[in-house]
């Protein structure tokens, strides 16, 4: 069975070190790739209704089984509205509500977590669902848990023992604005715990984290823990034998909002 998770895309903010035109070109390039992947899949999973996680078009999903975050339970007002709009577009599809559910397609089992906070407890961003796919290997896609800031979510990941872990990391590009240094400390602590206690083959640490060219310095304790233990902690770009665009952009075009910074050490916070 061919599965696509969260087929959506959004343009980066101006803190991303690539000119607007180049960012638009990248969006166009990867949106075409995403659309082709959806056309070629059997099952599409949508963990929540932010537009970087789904394209709200009906025709795109024709004939696909849709496994989606519940559109009415554990959902904020904005996403509830988007979910209703999306469901109106895909009425003819076979639809399953994902929250805390389990389905099997041939030899592939897809399990979903209970609704998880999109960041800190009580956040206005609402909830997402994590995805566990089991076949020859176990893959855990956390969706947007923003860190994780919440230790319970780190423990859940450790207990699942995935071979491949895809995790979004903290939104450090919002550090000192929407994201606090205390939450960065929690995220680093929880990521280190996951690295130390999970015998994964690969951990893809990406999404929110890779919007900030300082990411390796801010999370150096996580990367150093991985290196010390021989764990493969990499970005999605590196998994595909490419260099992260945020680093390439910084090298080519220079800094945006962060001109200087230091490595972040949690014991000083």
Language-model segments: which ranges?
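P-loop/Walker A phosphate-binding loop and immediately adjacent motor/lid segment at beta-alpha junctions
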Residues: 1-3, 12-14, 56-77, 181-182, ...
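Core dinuclear metal-dependent hydrolase active-site scaffold
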Residues: 1-39, 84-152, 244-247, 251-269
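Active-site neighborhood of phospho(di)ester-bond hydrolases with catalytic His/Asp-centered motifs
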Residues: 4-8, 41-52, 68-69, 140-145, ...
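Active-site metal-binding motif and surrounding structural segment of the metallo-beta-lactamase
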Residues: 19-69, 159-166, 173
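Active-site environment of divalent metal-dependent phosphoester hydrolases
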Residues: 49-55, 73-76, 146-151, 171-176, ...
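A short acidic, amphipathic alpha-helical/loop segment
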Residues: 56-59, 152-157, 218
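Binuclear metal-ion centers of metallo-dependent hydrolases, dominated by the metallo-beta-lactamase
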Residues: 99, 183-269
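Short, solvent-exposed loop/turn segments at secondary-structure boundaries
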Residues: 122, 154, 177-181
